[in-house]
Structure formats: C-alpha cells, structure tokens
Amino acid sequence: MEIIKGSTSTLYGGGAIAGLINLISKTPEEKRDLGLHLNGTSGKGLDVSAFYGQRFKKVGTTIFASYNRNWAYDPSNTGFTAIPQFDRYVFNPKLFLYFSENTQMSVGLNAMFEDRLGGDIEYIKGNGNDTHSYFEKNKTQRHSTQLTFEHKFGEKDRIDFKNSVTYFNRNIGVPTYTFEAVSYTHLTLPTN
C-alpha cells in the first residue's frame, strides 16, 4: 500500500485534497504466501478473507476470497438502520505466466456479489406492516477480467498491453420505486 498525503497525486493533482491511497497488487513469489483475516465490529459486522499466492518456476497464482456480513444496526434506537444488513462475496483468482526473463503475462477475474437491505428495523426482521413498511434494497453484481502482457526489448525499451472488461449490474428498490442498471465497459491500454 502506498499512501500519499496532501494534494500531490500524479493523476489527480491538487484535486486530491486529502491525499491518495494506491493499492499495489501482490505478485506470487516462490515462497508460499498464505493468509487468513477474521474481523468483528461493534457495529454488528463480520469480515472473513483469505489469500494464497505462490510461484512455480514458469507459472504463478494468487487467489483472494472474502465474505463480509453486517446485521441491521440501529445504535440510536430510532427504528431505522444506520448500517444496513448486507452480505458480500468477493472472489479474485489470477494466473501469472513467465515465458522468459523478458516476457510475462497475467490473467485475472474479479467477481463480487452483494445484497443489502436497509430501512425500518421491523421490516428487515420480517415484521413489515402499514406502519413499518420503509426499506431500501440494493442488489449488486460486478465482474471484471484483467489481462496484462509485458515484453522487455532492453533496459529502456519495452511494450505493455493491459486490458479489462467489466460487467456491472445493480437493482435498487424502495417501496414506490425500482431502479435497474446494467453496464459493460472495456479498456485497452497498449504502452511502450
């Protein structure tokens, strides 16, 4: 992780007033990297994640999986959620191919599924009626692919190719309105 404090972002410049955090992806090494993270919160939350990474000569892999859960949370006893009830699943496998010292490629997939339900606590508990009828439902799916190819011709000359295809689907519902959107995006960056 790289933390840049203040408005010195290369990409956003002075627009990044509070700074910027860059998450740098892990790449597999010969020594196995295995981790498990468990976290519970005072806001009725639970986080479980696992990571595995290892390189075997010409092939390597990283696999990240997580589950996040929050039960409906109303700390002020207003009868409405401050934090909605949700379940989120994330899966991110990635394959690395090392053709030679100068040529490598990686292929990855990101998949995320999330169901959220916020609003009236009684409705969320299954006790909805004319008085307890407000809710906000949000169902989201996001899937994306990652492809990178790099070839070095020398110390200063190289070519990089990066590609990503993303599918995003969201359904949002409140008692009198439903919204549904599907988005497909594609990005290709050849650089040298």
Which residues does each predicted region cover?
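N-terminal periplasmic accessory domains that precede
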Residues: 3, 11, 15-37, 50
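Residues that define the transmembrane beta-barrel architecture of outer-membrane proteins
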Residues: 15-17, 39, 44-46, 87-89, ...
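Short beta-strands and strand-coil junctions in structured, solvent-facing domains, enriched
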Residues: 8-11, 70
